[in-house]
């Protein structure tokens, strides 16, 4: 009420809230394991694939449950498209992982992440943080946005800095483009006190 939180701990720790935290966490573990499998060899790669398989199965179950529950609970009709794209990305990624196609597994899990984000935020729109007591207290895109001056400054910062970040990320990826293995890691030298 009046901008104050009126619930308790169990208002926040409900099954849907826990699923909204756990499903994306498992999806990012899955995505990270796919990337690690893509960039490694030998034992590191096998452990990453093993983690990817387990996290992928957990993600398909938890993520599928979250997407359908969220869609039924509050999603508009157009977000069913993103639900299908996210589910398809998860399934394709899991199948590509099983076929040892690390690049496709990584790309498909990235598509699933993008579709999940669009689905979850699309189901909230125009709210950014909906109120559970009265819709009048919800934070919307309009009342949570910055002033026009701030948005203008941030737009110019983004116009200048986004290409810099993209070039740096491209260069970083190019420098670390080869797969690594445990054998390519140099031994650690501990300095002795003299």
Predicted feature residues:
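Membrane-helix interface motif
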Residues: 1-2, 122-134
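Hydrophobic alpha-helical transmembrane segments
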Residues: 11-27, 147-165
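Transmembrane alpha-helical segments in integral membrane proteins
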Residues: 26-39, 161-178
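Membrane-interface capping segments at transmembrane-helix boundaries
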Residues: 96-103, 167-183
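Hydrophobic alpha-helical membrane-insertion segments
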Residues: 107-123
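Short, highly charged, low-complexity non-transmembrane loops/tails of multi-pass membrane proteins
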Residues: 112, 178-194
